[in-house]
UniProtKB/Swiss-Prot annotation:
Keywords: Ribonucleoprotein, Ribosomal protein. HAMAP family: Ribosomal_uL13 (MF_01366). The keyword Ribosomal protein applies. The gene is rplM. One of its GO terms (biological process) is negative regulation of translation. One of its GO terms (molecular function) is mRNA binding. This protein is one of the early assembly proteins of the 50S ribosomal subunit, although it is not seen to bind rRNA by itself. It is important during the early stages of 50S assembly. GO terms for cellular component: cytosolic large ribosomal subunit; ribosome. InterPro entries: Ribosomal_uL13 (IPR005822), Ribosomal_uL13_bac-type (IPR005823), Ribosomal_uL13_CS (IPR023563), Ribosomal_uL13_sf (IPR036899). Residues 125-144 are annotated as: Disordered. It comes from the Bacteria. This is Large ribosomal subunit protein uL13. SUPFAM superfamilies: Ribosomal protein L13. It comes from Aquifex aeolicus (strain VF5).
Length: 144
């Protein structure tokens, strides 16, 4: 008996909506990454993108534990001499809360083309409104 291998065109994709109000950042991000990879499906294969679409609303109401608001820093470089930039988590949550969740999930996905395709299925919004009502997203309860 041969092992069944699913083809990318056979994958059924659903849309999920997650409310981030009061949820812990890391726990929420790991659940979202699991859905984006497709690990919740019985036919999961690591080399096939079989994940679903995830919409995150109320990103500005995310919660973090400990002293991370002041101590956690995000770094990037402009590729110019002396171009190392840094921002604290507190600044990021005030100005770009969508980016905080997107980066947390991105760092939990594979670092290759497949991971890039998975990240494109993540939609993060600051408030409770999103433009994806036509896809009929189902609410996903995350215990985070």
């Amino acid at each position: 008996m041969k092992t069944y291998r699913i083809k990318p065109e056979e994958v059924e994709r659903k849309w999920w909506v997650v409310d981030a109000t009061g949820k812990t950042l890391g726990r929420l991000a790991s659940e979202i990454a699991k859905i984006l990879r497709g690990k919740h499906k019985p036919y999961y294969q690591p080399d096939v993108d079989c994940g679903d679409f995830v919409i995150v609303i109320n990103a500005e109401k995310i919660r973090v534990t400990g002293k991370k608001l002041e101590q956690k820093k995000y770094y990037w470089h402009s590729r110019y001499p002396g171009g190392l930039k840094e921002r604290t988590l507190k600044w990021m949550l005030e100005n770009k809360p969508e980016e905080v969740i997107r980066l947390a999930v991105k760092r939990m996905l594979p670092k290759n083309r497949l991971g890039h395709r998975m990240l494109k299925k993540l939609k993060v919004y600051r408030g409770p409104e999103h433009p994806h009502q036509a896809q009929k997203p189902q609410p996903l309860e995350v215990k985070a």
